[in-house]
Amino acid sequence: MTVKTFRGSPALSEFRLTQLQQKCQQYQLPITSVYAEYLHFVEQKTSLVEDEIVKLQALLHYGSMFSELKPAGYCLIVTPRVGTISSWSSKATDIAHNCGLSKVNRIERGIAYYFNIERDLTEAELATLKDLLHDRMLETVLNHETEAALLFTQQEPKALTTIDILNGGRQALEQANIALGLALADDEMDYLVESFTALKRNPQDVELYMFAQANSEHCRHKIFNADWIIDGKKQDKSLFKMIKNTFEQTPDFVLSAYKDNAAVMEGSKVGRWFPDPDGQYRVHQEDVHILMKVETHNHPTAISPFPGAATGSGGEIRDEGATGRGAKPKAGLTGFSVSNLVIPNFEQPWENPLSKPNRIASALDIMIDAPLGSAAFNNEFGRPALLGYFRTYEEKVNSFAGKEVRGYHKPIMLAGGIGNIRGEQVQKGEIPIGAKLIVLGGAAMNIGLGGGAASSMDSGKSKEDLDFASVQRENPEMERRCQEVIDRCWQLGEENPILFIHDVGAGGLSNAMPELVHDGKRGGKFDLRSILCDEKGMSPLEIWCNESQERYVLAVAPENLELFTALCERERAPFAVIGEATQAEHLILHDSHFDNNPIDLPMNVLLGKTPKMTREVLSKTVENQSLKIESIQLKEAFHRVLRLPVVAEKTFLITIGDRSVTGMVARDQMVGPWQIPVSDVAVTTASLDSYHGEAMAIGERSPVALLDFSASARLAVAEAITNIAGTLIGEMKRIKLSANWMSAAGHTGEDAGLYEAVKAVGEELCPALGLTIPVGKDSMSMKTTWIDNGEQKSVTAPLSLVISAFARVEDVRKTLTPQLRTDKGFSSLLLIDLGEGHNRLGATALAQVYKQLGDKPADVVKVQRLKDFYNAMQTLVAEDKLLAYHDRSDGGLITTLAEMAFAGHCGVEVDISALGDNDLAVLFNEELGAVIQVADSQLESVREVLKAHNLLGIIHQLGTVTADDRFEISRGSHKLFSEKRSELRSIWAELTYQMQRLRDNPECAEQEFEAKKNPDDKGLSAFLTYDVNEDITAPFINKGVKPTIAILREQGVNSHYEMAAAFDRAGFNAIDVHMSDLMIGRRNLAEFNAMVACGGFSYGDVLGAGGGWAKSILFNPKLHEQFSQFFINPNTLTLGVCNGCQMISNLAEIIPGTENWPHFVRNKSERFEARVSLVKINEVDSVWFAGMAGSHMPIAVSHGEGQVKFKSVEQFAGLKAQGIIAAQYIDNNGSPTELYPANPNGSSEGITAITNLDGRVAIMMPHPERVFRAVSNSWHPENWTEDGAWMRLFRNARMVF
C-alpha cells in the first residue's frame, strides 16, 4: 500500500492564529507568524486513477472560509497518535467507501503548522511548542509529511505480564501498585496476596488492574459504605444507610433506586412518539416514566478540561440509556466549581494570584474549555442542556483545620439529566446461560487507563503521566448511533432483544463486563481478540481496561442476535460479540493471539467480600469573627457581587449549548423577550402532544460548609426546593433528589463533617419533608497537593453537596419565571422571608468579595415553614395568581431583585424598612426565601393563600415595578441606592464578555456586550401576517390518502423525531428513512411525495457540516440518480433544516434553479450558537412560505456552521435578483442585520432561508420543527395557544397534496 498526501483548506482563522501566536509569545518562543492548514493522508490499496483522484480531491475540499496562504517556514504536522485510528478517520473512510472509492484503505487528517522563526528553536523551546499544539494522548507531532506512512503501520500486540507474589510476596504487589497506579489500600493488598496464594498461582497485570478498578472508591463507594467511629463512639449507620433512609421513609412514586445506572420515578401517561418497525412514526399512548442521574467527572476535567468534561456528559448520557432494558436520555444539566478565574485585565479584588501544580489546568482554562467540551457532547448527541450552576471559591480562611487555603484546584464538573423509560422495561431481565455478551459502540484505544483509581486519589498522589492517561476522549456521534440502536430495541416492546445492559465507564470492560454478568448472577467466558480495537499494539491489560468511550455492554439471547445485528447494521453502529454467559460464576478471558488466559478468576475474588472500611475520626469546631462590614459602601459592594461568577451573568456557558433539540423544551435558562439567563428551573414536556412534563432544579451552597457542615447540606436541599417550586408539581413527595457529595476525605475535620451533613439530610431534613434521594454519587478526594520551590502546598475544597431535584410536572404551561411584567397593570413585589429576619452574612457572596468568611451562615430556620412555603407556591401556581417568581440565593435580596428587573427590562422601587436595621445584612444575606410579583388586583387573594399556609408573618411588601430604567432601594424616605438598571445589567454582563473575548471571536464578543447596554432594546417580538391559531389543513383531515414524507437521516442526525411530529400534525404520514435504507434498497425516494433532511451532526461534521452526507450521495451513482430524479419531479417537495440545509446546499448541482445557492461555513463567532433569533419572512414564490410574507417571528437556532459563503460577489447578486431569499435575521427593531448576536452566524444581510426558483425546495438554518408548538418556544406572545407560528410552514406543504 502507498500513502498519498492531499492539501486541504486553512485550519485556523486569523484570530485563532493570533491567539496561538500570543501563547507562543507567553512562552517567549522566537516566532513571528503562524499559518495552519489541513493535510490529508490517503492510504491506497492500489493507485487511484485520474477520475478517482478528482473525486477524492472534491471529497477533501470542505470548510474553506479563511484566507489561503502559501505554506512557508518551519513546519510541524500534528496527526492522530501513531498506531491509532481516529474517529475522524473512521468516518471519512466510511464516506469515501460510500462514494465508491474502494481503492482507499484509510484516510487520516493532520494539521500542518508553518512558523516564521527568528532563529532555530532550542530543544526545550521545541518541546514547549509541541505541547501547545497537540494532545499527547491522542496526537503525534511529525516533522515532515513523508513521515505520514507511520500513521498506517500496524504494531504487534504486546504480551501480558505476571506479578510474582508466590515468590516475591506482598512486596511484589506493592511495587505493581505503584507502577500501575492501582491505588490499592493495605488491606486490599493483603486480600489479594491471600486470594492468589489460595489459588496457587500468580496474578496477571490485567487481573490486578481489573480488581483495582472494580474495587476503587470511585466504583465501590467504600467511604459511604464504611463503619464509622466518631469521637470514640461507634455510629449506628453508614453514610449510605442514612441516604437509603429517605427511601425507606418515602418510597412513594420511586420505581427503581440504588440498583441501576439511574433511578426511575413515576411519570405521566402520554402519547409517546416514535417509528414502528414498518418505519411509520405513530403515537403510542403509554406510561412514560422519568429516570434521573447526576455524575461528576472532576479528576479528568482538572487534567484535560475539554475531553474531561465532554466524557463526563457522555458517560452520564450512557448511564441513562443503559437503565433498565434500555431508555432514552432527554435533557441535561451541568455544573462547575473552580478556584478563582483571575482573568487577564479583569482581575478582581478578592482574587489572590495563588499558585497551582503544573499537572492540572488553571481555573480559567477549565472554564474556557470544560464547558465547551460538555456542551459539544450534548449538542452532537442531541440532548438539550437546560440547567447548571457555576461557583468560584479560593480563599485562605480559618476553618476546621485552622488557617488554610480552601478552594477548587480540583474542580467539580457536574453532569446530569433526565430521560424516559417504558414501564415494562424499568427492571433488567434474566441472563440465560449461553446469552451472547456484546460490546456495542466504538473500538478500543489506549486511552483513559485507570480512571476509576485515579479519580479515587487526592490530586498529586499519582504520577503525572498516569494522571493524563486516565482522561478519556470523546466521540458523541458514535454514542448517538448506539443510542439509536437502543431506541430501536426498547421501541419493540416485548420483542426488545436487550435483556441486560450497562454502560462502559470507569475501568472500561474490566468493570462493565464483570458487573453485567455478576448482576445477572452468571459468569462469563470471553475472547479478548473479538473486542474491536483501533490500536493493534495494545496489551491484554490495555484492551480490557482502557476507558474508550461510547460503549455499552449487553446480554442478548442467541435467538435474538440476528435481529440485534440487523438493527446495528442499519444504524451503522459497531458491535462485537465477545463472549457468552456461563452458569459457573467464573470469569475467563482467552487470548487467541498468545493462546493463553489473561484472566481466570472466580467472581467472588473480584467482587466478593473485600475488606470493609472503618473510619475512626474526630469532629472539629471552628470559631470565626463576624463580618467586618462597617466600612463597606453599598454601591461598591453590589458592583463587586454582580461580578462574582456565582452571581454574574452566565450567557457564555449557555448559548454554547443546544437548548431546543427534541422539540420538548418548555423552559430553558433564557427568560422572556430579552432572553436573560435567570430561570430557576428547567422544564420539558413528557411528549410532543402533551402538557405533562418533567422539571429539574439545582441547590448548592458549599462555602457555608466552611462554617457549618449540616447547614450547608440543608441549604442545598432547601434551595433545590425553592428553585423548583415555581412550576406545577403537586405534593412535595413527587420531588426526588440526587445528592452529589464532594469531600476531601482524611482532611482534618472533614470526615466527621461529612457524616454530620449526610445525617442532617438523610436522617432529618428529607424525611421531615417527605423527600427521597434515590440516586447520587460521591467524590472523596477533593484535595490538591504539590511542591512549589521546595514548599509543600495544598488547596482543599469545602465539603460540597450539590442537590439536583427532579419532578413530574402536571402542566408545563404553569411555570413562573423571574421576568417582571410591566404590561399587567399595577403590581407589588413581596418577599417571602423563610430566614425569618435572621439576615446572617456568613459565607455569603458579600463575604467572599471582601475576602472574609464571617461566623454565622444562613440555615433552614423551620422545616415545616419550608414545606408550607412549597405548598403555598403550588396553590398560587395552579391558580395563576403570580406574575413572576425568583428565589433568594447567592448575592441576596438585592441580586434577586436585580435579576428580575434585568429579565423584565424594567425598574423597581423597593423599601427595606421592615426587613431589619442593617442595610447590608438585609440586602446581601442569603437566607432562604423568594420574591413574587403580584398584580394588585390579586393581592388580597394571594395573601389569603399565604395565610392559609401560615406564612403571613414572614411576608413583606417591598415595593413596585416601574417601566423606566431605574433600580432604587430606600429605607423609608431615605434613598439608599439608585442606579440605572441598564448600567447594572452591563456590570452583570462583564464576566460573560471577558470570557467570550478570550474564547470566541472578540469582534462578536464586543458586539454582544454593546447590545446588552442598550436601555431601549425592544426584545423579541412577533408580528404575523396570518392567524397563528388557524389550521389551514383542517378541510383535508381524515379525507383521502395522506401524502407521505421521508424523514431522512444519516448517522449523527438528531432532530428527526420532532420533524416527523410536525409533519404528522400537518397531515403527512411520516416515515423514518435512514441513508442506509436508500443505499441497500430497503427504501427508494420514489415512494415519497416529500422529503425532509433533518438537523444534527451527520458523520460528526467530518468533511464539513453536511458535506460528507452530500458527497455520499453525489459520488454514489445509485443515490445520485435517485436524488436527481426526486428533485426534478415537479410533484415533490423538499426541505432541508440545519445539517439538512447544509447537506442539500451541497447537492445544488442536481437541484434545478439553485445555481446561485451559497454553501454554509463556520459561524463568525467560531462557536456553536444556540439562540432564539428573530427572522423576517420575505415575499418569495414558494409553497413553503405561502401566506407568511411580512411576518417577524422568533425561531430556535442551533448550529456551528451557518454562515453563508458565496463563490463570488456576482453569485450573491444573482441570488438577490432571483428573489429566492425566504428569510433573514433581523434585529429587535425589525431590520435585517449582520450584527451579533441578532445574526448568530454572520451571514451576509442576515440570509437564513433560501428556496430554489420554483419554490419546491427550501433550505434553512434555524429549526422550525423545534418550535411548532407554542409551549416549546422559549418566549412567545400570550395569544398563541397550542400551535407555534412555524406550524404554518408544515401545513403549507400539506396544502400542495
From Swiss-Prot:
Region of interest (Disordered), ranges: 301-329
UniProt keywords, alphabetically: ATP-binding, Cytoplasm, Glutamine amidotransferase, Ligase, Magnesium, Metal-binding, Nucleotide-binding, Purine biosynthesis
Residue numbers annotated as active site: C1138 (nucleophile), H1263, E1265
Gene3D superfamilies in alphabetical order: 3.40.50.880, Phosphoribosylformylglycinamidine synthase, linker domain (1.10.8.750), PurM-like C-terminal domain (3.90.650.10), PurM-like, N-terminal domain (3.30.1330.10)
Binding-site residues for Mg(2+), renumbered to this chain: D680, E719, N723, D887
Role description: Phosphoribosylformylglycinamidine synthase involved in the purines biosynthetic pathway. Catalyzes the ATP-dependent conversion of formylglycinamide ribonucleotide (FGAR) and glutamine to yield formylglycinamidine ribonucleotide (FGAM) and glutamate.
Subunit structure: Monomer.
PANTHER family, per the entry: PHOSPHORIBOSYLFORMYLGLYCINAMIDINE SYNTHASE
NCBIfam families on file: FGAM_synt, PRK05297.1
Name of the molecule in the record: Phosphoribosylformylglycinamidine synthase
Organism listed in the record: Haemophilus influenzae (strain ATCC 51907 / DSM 11121 / KW20 / Rd)
Lineage of source species: Bacteria, Pseudomonadati, Pseudomonadota, Gammaproteobacteria, Pasteurellales
The gene coding this protein: purL
